[in-house]
Amino acid sequence: GRSMHWIRIERFWEGEYPEVKMTPQQPMLCQQCGHATCEPVCPAFATVHSTAEQLNLQVYNRCVGTRYCANNCPYQVRAFNWRDYKRPEPLPNQLNPDVTVRRMGVMEKCTFCIQRIHKAQDKAKSEGREVADGEFTTACAQACPANAIVFGRVDNPESLVSQLAHKGHGVKHLEELGTLPNVTYFKGG
């Protein structure tokens, strides 16, 4: 059967035959592009860009399932929801109330846990302050046992992700396409 993944482990190869070797595997998720090729092809305007958060978002209740966005994504990170996930009572109570339940026939993707971002922004606003670095993180970063995923604002010089970015050695996948990806991959060490 089909299963839904918003992040996958991608294998890459380097070298020329017969001396080809596999490079370290990397997670591949929505790159939250500044010039996302998936946005202009959506006839229902379900794929939108949030300039405030600098994210590429999916408005699920607008999506009509044409899959044009998936065809236009060079990272192949969008997934079509082939199933209607109905659960018998009381199992629906286990669902995260902060995440929209999507219906069959819509496109899905990583949103960098926008619901967590908004929750932290609302809390900071009610307390009359800015959102602190590390105040929230994405679910994948929280669940990663190796702490290999770091989330934050690269435009905040105090943030850990900004400090990592300024050390250099970062790689952005398919940057040459002009999509302005916002995910940077760093070598471990």
Give the ranges of each region predicted by the language model.
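Non-ligating segments of multi-cofactor redox enzymes
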Residues: 1-189
